[in-house]
């Protein structure tokens, strides 16, 4: 009764208080406190709407009215457009389908749209080595502990029932944060255990979802409030892992033996939140706010002593230093190859598993790495942004341009560790190294040459004379499928490889490449004996026969040998078939494109 008189006395003196008391006739005190916090009220009302209980109302009409009110408070149609409301619904479903480990963390960032969620997850993958996938690599003990933390987070989320919220314990969030510290220590190891704060700062945390929800409640339910014994007995038993544990002096929160009591007191509910003046985000710790503000100011105080590159967070600098130290802590169990980043190991393991997550929308081709898809797309767009300053030739990849420039500079950066021989292109080095890796190569029993497994199969057809790929038009057979494909372009007239300089087209890419060297002046194939250089490898091989004296081509009539195979003219085709002239004509016509065939057949 005394409290009633006190309120009445203030009503005459303080008009705003009178309005507040009138409002409390229709809403709970917790509702009113939540409305004062505009930053997180939308999320609170969404949870109210989704978990509203029919039993909380006196009848169906009141229930429907209450649902409409909560939906209106959540979606705010008076201030949001239809597109914005749809985005809120899509955002809600997007957060729902995320894995539990990522879902809880993303919700702490309070994203405003689906694009912000994507940005947060991509930044997490890029900066923190895909921690969602690190979870799957934990030991059994770590996995069980992480699952327990997720379960505690779920149980720590406040019920959306208006009645049950009053009885919701106010000390679950700090315990969850203590549990999360232990999980982080398990993940990163003792060496990086002290960097928990920097790791969380790099992720720009805002505190977990339940703690944000609790901070919006009235101060009457915070640490200093005196609670009845029956409220404590209603605490879920799952939130207390042991009967006797150290507790917080302020609110009785149970702490594990390894949790930091000082850290808990600093984040205990009742402490002020720190808001960013630029974007409005709030943080439970001032250090988190300072770290976040560097995004707006561009400040990067952590600088690498080796290369001078600067970073916003200390943990990113530590990971960067691995580049200079050469440390590769992540090792593949299949082949033993080591990597400096977890994400690099994860991408590499897809080579063993055959996983290809990235698909091209134009042709359907799949890739195990995003970079592979990115470079592949340039084939369809014909984008070649990297241009050589010496010959103005353009390339789709920077790495290919770098290799090409070695033709002008004479640089051969790819050196064989076995014999020291250097090459301009990495592909040339890989082909060369097969010579040394005898244990991984397959040797031809006929001539002793070594090949890869597929290369040996094709090579053996030279000795057996097998030519399984046959042309349907002229019945000419080939050892390789690629040779048949190139040959068929003679009949179809297709010349897909066109020179950008003069417009001349060719049936083979290799012929186009060799032709383009006429314009650029490149002669990458050099003779070791006399120093003469050539545009094509075949020209170099033919030239080298001058020094070796080799003459592999022999005449069937007289037995005379030659260094080069003479090209057969159309006249010789007819002369060779003089006994059957029609057969010679048919063979000659079959080598022409269809348009020419029809023209010549009319004259015959």
UniProtKB/Swiss-Prot annotation:
GO cellular component annotations of the record: nucleus
Coiled-coil ranges per UniProt: none
One Pfam family hit: zf-C2H2
SMART domains cross-referenced by the UniProt entry: SCAN, ZnF_C2H2
Occurrences of domain SCAN box (ranges): 46-128
Major localization listed first in the record, in broad terms: nucleus
Covalent link location (Glycyl lysine isopeptide (Lys-Gly) (interchain with G-Cter in SUMO2)): 20, 25, 196
GO annotation (BP), single: regulation of transcription by RNA polymerase II
Record's function text: May be involved in transcriptional regulation.
Keywords per UniProt: DNA-binding, Isopeptide bond, Metal-binding, Nucleus, Repeat, Transcription, Transcription regulation, Ubl conjugation, Zinc, Zinc-finger
Descriptive protein name: Zinc finger and SCAN domain-containing protein 12
Region Disordered, annotated ranges: 154-175, 224-264
Organism: Pan troglodytes
Record has Transcription as a keyword: yes
